[in-house]
Amino acid sequence: DAPCSGEGMNYKHDKNTNYRDPKLAQGFSNLQYQILRSGVLATKVWGEIVYSTCTLNPLENEQVIWKILKEFEGAVELSNVEIDEKSPGLMQYWDENLLSQEDAQKVARFWPHKQKTGGFFIAKLKKLSSLPYTTQYDKRKKEKIWLNDSFELQSQVWNYLLENRG
């Protein structure tokens, strides 16, 4: 259950459903993507990950799944969420394509007015193959870093440290 804007719960608790903060939703979307990405990297081959939110916002749901499927194409796939009376995911949001028709049928979306519950979203991913894991450290190791080993620079650093750090 990823941190989310909680927009789906507003309907359940009769809160103001007209207020939506796009910046907040985009911030959550970025965080959710990073969390799910870390989960994909940490999951063993043939392992499954269940992703869920209590929001109706496609930026926090289908878009996150779309980005993961795109980044890890061929190594991760959607599995069918087998829940009765679920609604399919969204294939498009405004002018942005999200999920294919096949993938939209695999995820579960729950609408307050249809399922008489708070709004939420569920997707199930399966990892099909191992992935290369790179860190910022790995990227830096590949780049040549030229060090200035001149006595003058060393002397300047030493003097600065003595004066400012004791």
What do the predicted segments below correspond to?
Residues D1-G166:
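S-adenosylmethionine
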